Curated annotation (Swiss-Prot):
This is Lithostathine-1-alpha. SMART domains: CLECT. The composition of the O-linked carbohydrate on Thr-27 is complex and varied. In the crystallographic structure, the attached sugar appears to be N-acetylglucosamine, typical of an intracellular protein, rather than N-acetylgalactosamine. In pancreatic acinar cells and, in lower levels, in brain. Enhanced expression of PSP-related transcripts and intraneuronal accumulation of PSP-like proteins is found in brain from Alzheimer disease and Down syndrome patients. One of its GO terms (cellular component) is extracellular exosome. GO terms for molecular function: growth factor activity; molecular function inhibitor activity; oligosaccharide binding; peptidoglycan binding; signaling receptor activity. The keyword Disulfide bond applies. It is found in: Secreted. Disulfide bonds join 36-47, 64-162, 137-154. The modification Pyrrolidone carboxylic acid is found at residue 23. Residues 1-22 form the signal peptide.
Length: 166
């Protein structure tokens, strides 16, 4: 009798295994849809805001800090860069430069994001950063479809993109 019971248990286990074989266990829970304030756009787990007011780099970053504790946008991947570029282009702006959060605070050509994120992805335009005419703050340029970076003087006034968690 015990042998028959073991036989049925073995058959049951084999049937279960054959039914579940080839199915991957769900390891990630679906992400909740992020809700961003009106006038901003969501990408992954952040909200983005394009402001056409022209400010210096410092004033633009302060504006972003006062707006939901954000910063000028840190572009951490090529995909995020493409999203930011489309956000700027969709605005219909005629600006040639748009501030992002990359800067060289010690003027030693070591770049930092104002958000504190690590600089691992880079998208410098041709000839940038410049050694001939160095700037210590970074903008996206319209000539590259707002996808490439250029170092420019921090005192210049450009529109800008903020990035923040909601």
């Amino acid at each position: 009798m015990a042998q028959t019971s073991s036989y049925f248990m073995l058959i049951s286990c084999l049937m279960f295994l054959s039914q579940s074989q080839g199915q991957e266990a769900q390891t990630e829970l679906p992400q909740a849809r992020i809700s961003c304030p009106e006038g901003t756009n969501a990408y992954r787990s952040y909200c983005y805001y394009f402001n056409e007011d022209r400010e210096t780099w410092v004033d633009a970053d302060l504006y972003c800090q006062n707006m939901n504790s954000g910063n000028l946008v840190s572009v951490l991947t090529q995909a995020e860069g493409a999203f930011v570029a489309s956000l700027i282009k969709e605005s219909g702006t005629d600006d040639f430069n748009v501030w992002i959060g990359l800067h060289d605070p010690k003027k030693n050509r070591r770049w930092h994001w104002s958000s504190g994120s690590l600089v691992s992805y880079k998208s410098w335009g041709i000839g940038a950063p410049s050694s001939v005419n160095p700037g210590y703050c970074v903008s996206l340029t319209s000539s590259t479809g707002f996808q490439k970076w250029k170092d420019v003087p921090c005192e210049d006034k450009f529109s800008f993109v903020c990035k923040f968690k909601n």
